[in-house]
Amino acid sequence: MTPAPTTRTRIKICGLTREEDVDAAVEAGADAVGFVMYETSPRYVTAGRAAELARRLPPFITPVLLFVNAPATQISAACALIPTAFLQFHGDETPEDCLAAGRPFMRAARIPLGEKSAENTPGSPGGFDLVKYAQDFKAAQAILLDAHVEGYGGGGKTFNWSLLPPNVSAHLVLSGGLTPANVIDGISQVRPRCTTLAVDVSSGVEISKGIKSADKINQFVAAVRAADELLAKSPHHVRVPPA
């Protein structure tokens, strides 16, 4: 019997600001690195600086530019400097806004945190309809799941993974409070719910905001690979709570 195909979890290290952190992500085996184009973020870099850092990337590692309600002129100027960039929209952008950039993109979904909310039901955390959201942004290459906190970005918080819908017809990127210690559990809970799964980490591999730890990056990547190996060998370890 031919064994079932396995899926390697793709990894993005986000919020990079330094050459050594880009190099550490590459050496650890990350698939993508993220540069924050949102000026109020402590991890903000200019488009010019992002272009300098992106030039360190070898082939087949993707630079991702994160925007929050940015004007079209800012997006196009950044894309001109980094022609291979993939876009991440993390604000209040509409499907039309995302498509107007004319580049491959993923769209962040802000998942409510409140574990005790009366609106929390299986498949609808905090009343948020992820299935509809994914359909609304069906042109996106992926939907990134982040915790809904004040402002934009997940603030290093995790949401309740067990409340996600059991079947989302989309490529998902799990984000929000991931660390080397919890990413195995996150992958095991979320992967069976979607088409494919990737993970995105920022604060979980930092020394301070915008300053990454090479050791933590290596630990995170190793944990993701351990999750892949565990699920390939023992699919019953994948945990999906009953509906």
Predicted feature residues:
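N-terminal beta1-alpha1 ligand-phosphate binding loop
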Residues: 12-24, 28, 36
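Glycine-rich phosphate-binding active-site loops on the catalytic face of alpha/beta enzymes
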Residues: 30-42, 88-94, 148-149, 154, ...
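A C-terminal functional module that forms or caps the active site or interfaces directly
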Residues: 173-192, 206
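N-terminal amphipathic alpha-helix/helix-capping segment at the start of soluble metabolic enzymes
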Residues: 1-14, 235-243
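Conserved anion-binding
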Residues: 36-42, 48-49, 54-182
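Structural motif
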Residues: 28, 81-82, 138, 189-194
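C-terminal helical cap(s) of enzyme catalytic domains, especially alpha/beta-barrels
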Residues: 47-57, 98-100, 187, 202, ...
